[in-house]
Amino acid sequence: EKIYGAAVTDSSLHGRLFRGTKRLLGDEDVRRLMVFDHPFRLVALITPLLLRIRQSIEADVGSVSGANLGYPVNFEGRDAFSNQLALSRLGEAFGYAGVKEQHFYPEPIAAAVSFLHSNADAQGETLLCLDFGGGTLDFCVLRRQGQSFSVVATHGIGLGGDHLDQILFRELLFPELGKGEVWRRRGFDREIETRFPFEEFEDLLVNWAVTYTLNQNRYTTPVLERIATGGPGTQKFERLRDVIQHNLSYLIFARIKTLKAALSTQSTATLDVPEIDLQIDLTRHDFEQMIAQPLQRVAEALDETVRKAGLRHDDIDIVLGTGGSSLIPAVKGLLEERFAGRVVEHDPFTSVAAGLAIANYRGLRFKQP
């Protein structure tokens, strides 16, 4: 049985903060998350959040026993049963939270429902929705029929804003934390010079939920020894020490999100992390170069969605962009290249939630393929 994250005692921390656990639901290998040296099932961690949401809703509207529940078209996972596993886990958690009548509804379709509700007079029969959120990239193609619609195709891949944030962390932060630096230390009869083994730190730094596990001697000892030797690059390892000791990865990712948002409206922005005395300027052009490979995946997934619908790009009347990452100018550019003059932006951060509420009110259901 695999446990996600090293089984080390984290009793010195005030708590463990988890984000993006939805991304783990479809991974059969991820069965437990460690909290204060105790393994918790994913379902056990998700249930209290869902219970709190239900109770908050009931405080305003009364008893809630059923709901339309959003999910990505394809959960992240390693096999063909990832969606089945994820929906089973999610359904179990909702059940424990008191939501017994469950109607799973794909998130891009929910976003499209929200758009059509707000824009009933929008012209066009065929609508394509791109929902580019934090963890997944989802698509749907709908055909409008009066006041109703039919689902022509859905598609989704495991790519989201969180993946772009990790790329920025690697490209911008790693060189400033000691990657590529030399490590000189005294051997038995001579001085030994090697590259500092930064690769051992990389995955834990960019997965901030488990960055705290770097507070073990196997990681901290070489960092402190490298600082003690002095010389060029010492400040970089002092930064690495501070990131580890003060568990700063989450804070840095928050600053990266701010940087990314700024580059959606201006050509140059600054990543400012005063906690480790670091400022890095980044141009939109360089940002787009860094995320060139994910952008290619976006383009390929977009074209695959149109192909699955049995359509050509010219057959699409309305192209709806939603989700925070849809605001990235390069993503907008991909849409405009293929659907010039037909791209609209809609409520990037709450369209899915609004659409789920509307779909539930109207009794809209989605039959699982």
Question: Where are the regions that the model predicts?
Answer:
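Phosphate-binding glycine-rich/basic clefts of nucleotide- and phosphate-handling proteins
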Residues: R144-E275
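ATP-binding/phosphotransfer module of carbohydrate and carboxylate kinases, centering on a glycine-rich
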Residues: R297, A301-D314, L327-G341
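Conserved phosphate-binding/catalytic loops in two-lobed NTP-binding clefts
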Residues: A97-Y105, D314, K332-A357
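Phosphate/pyrophosphate-binding loops at sites that engage ATP/ADP/AMP, CoA/4′-phosphopantetheine
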Residues: I53-A67, A299-D317
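Nucleotide/phosphate-binding catalytic cleft detector across ATP-hydrolyzing
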Residues: T9-C129, P232-H285
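Glycine-rich beta-strand-to-loop/alpha-helix junction loops that act as flexible
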Residues: Y71-P72, I318-S325
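A polyampholytic, Gly/Pro-enriched intrinsically disordered region
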Residues: D121-L130, K179, Y361-P369
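Gly/Thr-rich phosphate-binding beta-strand-loop-beta motif of the actin/hexokinase/Hsp70
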Residues: L13-H14, H117-S150, G321
